[in-house]
């Protein structure tokens, strides 16, 4: 947004300025667009600064000083993930930048943007949001620096973090600042993180001990504690749990795992408690998660007047938009519970679904776009087939703390009917101007097995030749560490998929997404997977190395070498050479990987897989001497 655009709207000043590390795309798949439209819908004047130059504060001044606050996001993904490969090399393409150009956002973007804003406007409130701030809200392992870093709120000169899907939080913050409240007094909004002075925290704890009959060693209460009625010790310590401090978790991996387990199990909007984590210069306090949006609220958010286009100032397309331009978001949340995924911590396990009518209205608008070719190329949310699903316990106690929804097997309390999704897909197919409705990715195949009608409809109408699914691995030890279904479930799905395709008279294929280097995965496990692929014909180029990203179970395993829920020790491949060997075993047919595959087989004592026999992964040949 430019100053000229502000003037064209007849505005003399803005209420809120959003700063993002992504290009600005006015589409509901982009977090900044949603937050901007939601604030605008609530009556606020909103400006957006996309991908500012961060070497000095000048770009942050171009829209002037907002009346209420700045909101800062690194973008749709963590800036480390956007900028760097799993091997920590610079990426050669950025899907969230015009033309895929790299170098338009810094590493640790949320912190750097906040610093520049503070230089430009020292007294302005700053609210952090988005996946980077959300997943770094506690002390966390940082893969780039290979150490435990403080909460992002301790490192950035910001006042609040909005974590999760932040529509309700951001509007309430704006309304309360509009009403004249000081941002430092806004401490009671679910789904936010705030900070307290160390002295005030010690006094609050002292008062808590006094009320519990212990000796209060604190002096007179600070002004912060004395004036804030929400800091009644008796009530506070009923609603909040203290976890080990930054100093403790950064020095002891077992303590890190213990702290992780505590806050992971409290991420429940119904029964969860707030979390307190002391840091050397401040106290980080997370309120319990915000509730999911209702169906009516979700419908409203997704039917705001998005243009579905990039900002007109861009001369090149933004690749991320091209992937989702003609797709439809049906729901939020995921109860899959994969250890390496951040969605559980960001969107929660409880599914919030839009109404069928709302989705149909959006689909009709897509058909009216001049570049629409009759194909809706994606229908779903974090997964394709959890739309409309629910559990009878969610309303009263949220998602269960003592068990997962799908692992090690599908919970019988879960309603796994695809009936509502089937109705939606059928009605989408009937819309004038729609030739195909595809769901070629994101299908949770263990859920699909629960509903044969859905699987048959999927094969008959909603795949364009290939179905991309993510078994991730075929070693039981590794899929257990990932909290993913084992190969037996995969094989059952593949059999049913092939049977339904034969029935439909279609020739369609499964494309597997696989992962190397996950905690718990050894060279022997990778060889087991290579042998499975050899025997079952699932060789694929769709592979990735495990990347430790903040606040996932797998990252906790990677850093600590422990399962945070059982305390069991786990093998972790940290050596670059072993990581390369693990990845090479997934591409054992590639001649460029011969030496790495040979070394892996030699190290694992499996040279029986080198030779000309059918079972061999690579042929025997004269190796280059090093």
From Swiss-Prot:
InterPro entries for the chain: Elp3/MiaA/NifB-like_rSAM (IPR006638), Methylthiotransferase_CS (IPR020612), rSAM (IPR007197), rSAM_horseshoe (IPR023404), UPF0313 (IPR022946), UPF0313_C (IPR024560), UPF0313_N (IPR013704)
Cofactor info, note text: Binds 1 [4Fe-4S] cluster. The cluster is coordinated with 3 cysteines and an exchangeable S-adenosyl-L-methionine.
Gene Ontology terms for molecular function: 4 iron, 4 sulfur cluster binding; catalytic activity; iron ion binding
Domain named Radical SAM core: residues: 320-589
SMART domains in the record: Elp3
Stretches the record annotates as Disordered: 206-227
Cofactor field: [4Fe-4S] cluster
Residues where [4Fe-4S] cluster binds: 334, 338, 341
Keywords linked to the UniProt accession: 4Fe-4S, Iron, Iron-sulfur, Metal-binding, S-adenosyl-L-methionine
Family that this chain belongs to: Belongs to the UPF0313 family.
Record-linked NCBIfam families: SAM_YgiQ
Name of the featured protein: UPF0313 protein MM_1287
Lineage, highest ranks first: Archaea, Methanobacteriati, Methanobacteriota, Stenosarchaea group, Methanomicrobia
């Amino acid at each position: 947004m430019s100053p000229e655009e502000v003037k064209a709207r007849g505005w003399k000043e803005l209420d809120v300025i959003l700063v993002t590390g992504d290009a600005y795309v006015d589409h509901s798949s982009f977090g900044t667009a949603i937050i901007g439209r939601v604030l605008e819908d609530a009556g606020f004047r909103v400006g957006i600064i996309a991908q500012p130059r961060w070497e000095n504060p000048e770009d942050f001044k171009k829209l002037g000083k907002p009346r209420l606050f700045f909101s800062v996001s690194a973008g749709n993904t963590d800036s480390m993930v956007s900028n760097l490969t799993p091997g920590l090399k610079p990426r050669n393409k950025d899907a969230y930048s015009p033309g895929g150009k790299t170098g338009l956002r810094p590493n640790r973007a949320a912190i750097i943007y906040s610093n520049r804003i503070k230089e430009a406007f020292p007294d302005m409130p700053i609210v952090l949001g988005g996946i980077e701030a959300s997943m770094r809200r506690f002390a966390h392992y940082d893969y780039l620096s290979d150490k435990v870093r403080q909460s992002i709120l301790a490192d950035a000169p910001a006042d609040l973090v909005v974590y999760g899907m932040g529509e309700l939080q951001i509007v309430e913050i704006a309304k309360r600042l509009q009403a004249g409240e000081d941002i430092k007094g806004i401490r009671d909004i679910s789904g936010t993180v705030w900070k307290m002075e160390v002295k005030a925290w010690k006094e609050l704890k002292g008062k808590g001990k006094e009320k519990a009959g212990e000796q209060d060693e604190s002096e007179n209460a600070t002004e912060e504690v004395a004036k804030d009625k929400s800091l009644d010790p008796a009530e506070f310590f009923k609603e909040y749990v203290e976890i080990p401090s930054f100093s403790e978790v950064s020095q002891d991996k077992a303590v890190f795992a213990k702290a992780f387990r505590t806050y992971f199990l409290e991420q429940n909007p119904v029964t969860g408690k707030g979390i307190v984590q002391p840091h050397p210069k401040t106290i980080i306090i997370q309120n319990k998660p915000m509730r999911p949006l209702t169906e009516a609220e979700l419908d409203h958010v997704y039917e705001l007047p998005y243009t579905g286009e990039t900002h007109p100032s861009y001369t090149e397309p933004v690749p991320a938009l091209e992937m989702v331009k003609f797709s439809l978001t049906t729901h939020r949340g995921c109860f899959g519970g994969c250890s390496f995924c951040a969605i559980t911590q960001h969107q929660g396990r409880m599914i919030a679904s839009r109404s069928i009518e709302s989705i149909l209205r959006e689909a009709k608008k897509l058909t009216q776009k001049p570049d629409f070719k009759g194909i809706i190329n994606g229908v779903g949310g974090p997964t394709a087939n959890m739309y409309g699903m629910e559990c009878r316990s969610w309303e009263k106690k949220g998602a269960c703390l003592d068990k997962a929804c799908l692992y090690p097997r599908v919970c019988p309390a879960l309603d796994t009917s695809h009936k509502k999704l089937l109705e939606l897909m059928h009605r989408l197919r009937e819309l004038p101007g729609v030739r195909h409705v595809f769901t070629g990715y994101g299908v949770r195949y263990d859920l699909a097995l629960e509903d044969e009608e859905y699987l048959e409809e999927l094969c008959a109408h909603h795949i364009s030749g290939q179905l991309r699914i993510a078994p991730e691995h075929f070693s039981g030890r590794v899929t257990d560490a990932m909290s993913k279904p084992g190969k037996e479930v995969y094989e059952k799905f593949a059999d049913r998929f092939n049977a339904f395709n034969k029935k439909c008279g279609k020739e369609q294929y499964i494309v597997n997404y696989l992962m190397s280097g996950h905690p718990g995965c050894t060279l022997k496990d990778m060889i087991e997977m290579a042998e499975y692929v050899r025997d079952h014909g699932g060789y694929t180029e769709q592979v990735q190395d495990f990347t430790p990203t903040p606040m996932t179970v797998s990252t906790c395993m990677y850093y600590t070498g422990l399962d945070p829920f059982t305390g069991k020790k786990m093998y972790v491949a940290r050596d670059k050479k072993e990581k390369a060997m693990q990845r090479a075993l997934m591409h054992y047919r590639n001649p460029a990987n011969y030496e790495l595959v040979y070394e892996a087989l030699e190290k694992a004592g499996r040279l029986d897989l080198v030779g000309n026999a059918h079972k061999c992964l690579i042929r025997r040949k004269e190796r280059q001497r090093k």
